[in-house]
Amino acid sequence: MSSSRPMFRSRWLPYLLVAPQLIITVIFFIWPAGEALWYSLQSVDPFGFSSQFVGLDNFVTLFHDSYYLDAFWTTIKFSTFVTVSGLLVSLFFAALVEYIVRGSRFYQTLMLLPYAVAPAVAAVLWIFLFNPGRGLITHFLAEFGYDWNHAQNSGQAMFLVVFASVWKQISYNFLFFYAALQSIPRSLIEAAAIDGAGPIRRFFKIALPLIAPVSFFLLVVNLVYAFFDTFPVIDAATSGGPVQATTTLIYKIYREGFTGLDLASSAAQSVVLMFLVIVLTVVQFRYVESKVRYQ
């Protein structure tokens, strides 16, 4: 029986082929992670010229800092809202394509447009619409007696950054959900319809289980997106305010490292965030993926 393993004339060729990826991984991932871990154990002067080993003192100080703990729980809430809302809304719009006969191409194009917008631009767009004095949406809300001012109301500020972040990510999720739904054999849907199953029952009993692998992939991607890629949205929309109500871990790392020049604390926070993402990823692959059945 012939082996399917590719054979190379030179034993060095496989290493040469993977070398670019290994170099990129070392330079842009492993090296920065190692530097962050090293600085998290040091007391560094603001300009980084001198340092002193302090062990775990930075982490002890971190977990006794009420502002950091607030940012930690804000990150958990924000990431949960963005991930769950983004997946549910995108899946809903992807499922609607099945019932749109006229203008389906226009509808699909419209759903993909937000992905072409930069995160900071998306934040500015919704800031204009939710502007307390001149915003179209705030004017509409005022007609119903609702006063909107996200610069002073922490709940409204959180809603704004979650809404803008979800809107920016909808296109990405929609594309994968739509492709997954289109890959489901029509014969299964038609057989269920003949047996008397309605649209909702067909979706939950047939479509949803079959797109579980895609849903799991998007769950991981959206969680990473909520932790890291929403930084421009928060920076442009609220700058972490009001009163740190929208300050997530990634934004706090930036503010303390680049504005406050506290390199040791910023590095310690980076290590904690890295560890948190690793733990959540392991939990997802260990427990969530075990429920997924790949066809």
Curated annotation (Swiss-Prot):
One of its GO terms (cellular component) is plasma membrane. It is a multi-pass membrane protein. It holds the Pfam family BPD_transp_1. The keyword Cell inner membrane applies. Residues 76-284 form the ABC transmembrane type-1 domain. It is found in: Cell inner membrane. The chain crosses the membrane at residues 12-32, 81-101, 110-130, 157-177, 208-228, 263-283. Residues 33-80, 131-156, 229-262 are periplasmic. Residues 1-11, 102-109, 178-207, 284-295 are cytoplasmic. InterPro entries: MetI-like, MetI-like_sf, UgpAE/MalFG_permease. It comes from the Bacteria. CDD domains: TM_PBP2. Part of the ABC transporter complex UgpBAEC involved in sn-glycerol-3-phosphate (G3P) import. Probably responsible for the translocation of the substrate across the membrane. Belongs to the binding-protein-dependent transport system permease family. UgpAE subfamily. The complex is composed of two ATP-binding proteins (UgpC), two transmembrane proteins (UgpA and UgpE) and a solute-binding protein (UgpB). This is sn-glycerol-3-phosphate transport system permease protein UgpA. The lineage of its organism: Bacteria, Pseudomonadati, Pseudomonadota, Gammaproteobacteria, Enterobacterales. The gene is ugpA.
